[in-house]
């Protein structure tokens, strides 16, 4: 049993701007406990008589200043706790502080650089490294990840649900047994045999966490998360099992609503966060008071889950994260006061050992059977009754495991019962005979199959040859198509930089018959149409959300928009930097692999030389009837020293390669996490853009329906400006001079003719024109053509016939 108080540490976050830095000092006297002094200057607006306290001093186990890196924090805080967990004690590390003070960065780490890894990934690396070194015990590791959001628990690692939102995850409920032990229903435990599997589970859970932007923090975690490592160990053949668990807790940040001014959904989240932290503080105060008979653990889910960590069988450590900017000094002082109360709590950590009853029963049964066999051998008693079915099945299982065991020293232990010995010999004989019969049947069947398959081989070869030829043709066609598309894309990028005013001032409208500017038509026809994806047409609006999904389901326009969004995103620089680092690590790993192979071959060569040298000396001594000289051979000693040097070099490079492997996998996880975040933000942005375009844009006629289209001069100007911004994406806007606009999607090759003007729109027209003049007559040169003469003539005839029908309909209605 280990009795100790909760260890408290402080970490100071660097300020965003230096002029916002508050006044503080750190006293790290070796004879005394380090202390942090915060100076809160008096406000002159409070008047001349102001007795407000200016200096606040707090003591911690250690204080990490702004320049402390993640490695230093892990070595001094998490490593001792992880070592006690390996020894069989429970451990907890939790970070407490206001929002934006660096709790998530300390516990989980940053997503930008590998050196920014937090306590969780570094602890996983340390634990699995120690497990590999200790081969005297059998270890089993399980991972769980719990999120508490608005007083509801969610399992972030549930494999049975594909979570697109937090509500899709299964809810975790708290159950309590008669011994007042807490059990979490619906919280899954995932076994992790390697560090890579554990990091993958951490990455999976982090992608499902609730993160939102607040005035204090752009990526504020809006929930409490508890990452738990369950570790069990036992020695081979022993019935004693050690269990330990390590809670790594990332609390949501407290914030003063009056200061931040949040509202709506963020306000609801802030209420739940502040309430749960208030209940946590109540538990801390109750535990620090010696004569309190009741501890209010059940007030919140978080205090119920952390019952052992706060006042029970656990070695607990707290990290107070401080943001010592001028505007945050009050919250930082409050955090330090909370830490001082936490330091008064004393826990009693007990070694979690238990005896597995199943292993004890199995060991005792085996011991009883051995004693019975020894007794039968001594007394010479022979049993005559037949073996039971259970005994026969047990003997056959023993024989099967004996035959499958590759160990040459394995034994078939059936005791001194001659009935069992005879049955084992009979069973082995039966297995041998069955194997011979099976081999004979297999040989005969193979000979028959060869005779039958000879006529079919030629036909099968011919079919395979035809299929191969067909696949080659398909590949050639696809390659040609790819080259053409690449050429179109390059020309589109080249022509996309044309000045828009020159395009509008051009005398000839686009898609003129016989237009020699084929590159212009290629640009308009090959540029991805944002109109196809924003879908202002009513019929396509229902398909919008289906297109906003994973990258492989995106349309061409959506993919281009995603590339632009990714290029302009703030995380693109981080992703590119990680790509460069990953490329360097891959190159280094490749070079190390080659060096390791060279060292391995050199070690083998040196061993062979030493062996040959030794054989030559022995042969020389035998031929000359001389004993082997006692003095060591200098050449052999030199070879042995080279061999040892190569072994050390090989071991060093191999260790570095393993570290590189872990770093590469962590970088890949960071990149995957950034890509998932980028994808989610793009989906939100894309949906907002599509919704805004549908709300702000007027009704546009489809090919099958025509409706009156009325606009004021202001709305006409806004609509024209909106569509002119989309002209580079493939939209063509034409003002017919009657208060109407014709919109055609030149990529989709669809023409949306203007409807007949209503009488109201004719009154609004500046110049009165005859009714037949108001019918839009699209110039032939503005019709998008294909280049084929027959097809183009059919298109022109169809447009003329349609305009004639529209004109007759308008005349008939008037």
Swiss-Prot record:
GO terms classed as biological process: microtubule-based movement
Residue positions binding ATP: 97-104
UniProt region (Disordered), positions on chain: 752-788
Coiled-coil region list: 356-385, 456-494, 588-683
Primary site of residence: cytoplasm
Biased amino acid composition, Polar residues: 759-771
Key word Nucleotide-binding present: yes
One of the record's GO cellular component terms: kinesin complex
GO MF, one annotated term: ATP binding
Domain Kinesin motor stretches: 5-345
Annotated signal sequence range: none
Mutagenesis / variant outcome for changing residue 386 to E: In a breast cancer sample; somatic mutation
Protein's cellular compartments: Cytoplasm, Cytoskeleton
Alphabetized UniProt keyword annotations: ATP-binding, Coiled coil, Cytoplasm, Cytoskeleton, Microtubule, Motor protein, Nucleotide-binding
Membrane-spanning intervals of the chain: none
Record-linked PANTHER family: CENTROMERE PROTEIN E, KINESIN MOTOR DOMAIN-CONTAINING PROTEIN
Family: Belongs to the TRAFAC class myosin-kinesin ATPase superfamily. Kinesin family.
Protein name per the record: Kinesin-like protein KIF6
Biological source species: Homo sapiens
